[in-house]
Amino acid sequence: MMLHSALGLCLLLVTVSSNLAIAIKKEKRPPQTLSRGWGDDITWVQTYEEGLFYAQKSKKPLMVIHHLEDCQYSQALKKVFAQNEEIQEMAQNKFIMLNLMHETTDKNLSPDGQYVPRIMFVDPSLTVRADIAGRYSNRLYTYEPRDLPLLIENMKKALRLIQSEL
């Protein structure tokens, strides 16, 4: 009798937990296709030209993330970028955001070569800020997961430079 009750209770718990898991999954928004996993709550522009237009119009800096789906370094950076609340909040509210899986015709976005991941900032006057760099001398604009504090600092620097130049 007790075994029968315990079995019934287990079955009930499994049913409730699986229904709860289904309900939680349904609550999640479908991924925004333009985010490509970098942050579904961020409004992403589709093209570099669109990004430049909105940067100039809104007086916000444009942050351009070059990456590839099959690059382990891009994937590792994307994972921590998407999970970092401070980065997501700044990206969502203070930047025009673009992530690209192909190169643009603007050679200013690849001052030291075409590699991924690469993050560049463009100010509202449409100047590529080559002075905002990462920590690696051989790939100035790349960031690794452990470099998030530097990326956050560089995002803040991009915002400060705009304030001081307006």
From Swiss-Prot:
**Which keywords appear in this protein's UniProt record, sorted alphabetically?**
Endoplasmic reticulum, Signal
- Predominant subcellular localization, coarse grouping: endoplasmic reticulum
Q: What induces it?
A: Not induced as part of the cellular response to endoplasmic reticulum stress. Up-regulated by androgens and by estrogens in prostate cancer cells Up-regulated by a hormone (estrogen-receptor alpha) independent mechanism in ovarian cancer.
Tissue/organ expression: Expressed in the lung, in the ciliated cells of the airway epithelium. Expression increased with differentiation of airway epithelial cells. Not detected in the mucous cells. Expressed in ciliated cells in the oviduct. Also detected in stomach, colon, prostate and liver. Expressed in breast, ovary, prostate and liver cancer. Expression is associated with the level of differentiation of breast cancer (at protein level).
Q: Which domain of life is it from?
A: Eukaryota
Thylakoid among keywords = no
Coiled-coil blocks: none
**Short sequence motif Prevents secretion from ER: positions:** 163-166
Which Pfam families does this chain map to?
Answer: Thioredoxin_7 (PF13899)
Can you say where in the cell this protein is located?
Endoplasmic reticulum
Q: Which GO terms describe its molecular function?
A: dystroglycan binding
Signal sequence residues: 1-21
Which purpose does this protein serve, as stated in its record? Answer: Required for calcium-mediated regulation of ciliary beat frequency and mucociliary clearance in the airway. Might be involved in the regulation of intracellular calcium in tracheal epithelial cells.
What does the annotation say about its assembly with partners?
Answer: Interacts with LYPD3 and DAG1 (alphaDAG1).
Put simply, this protein is called Anterior gradient protein 3
| Species per Swiss-Prot/TrEMBL record | Homo sapiens
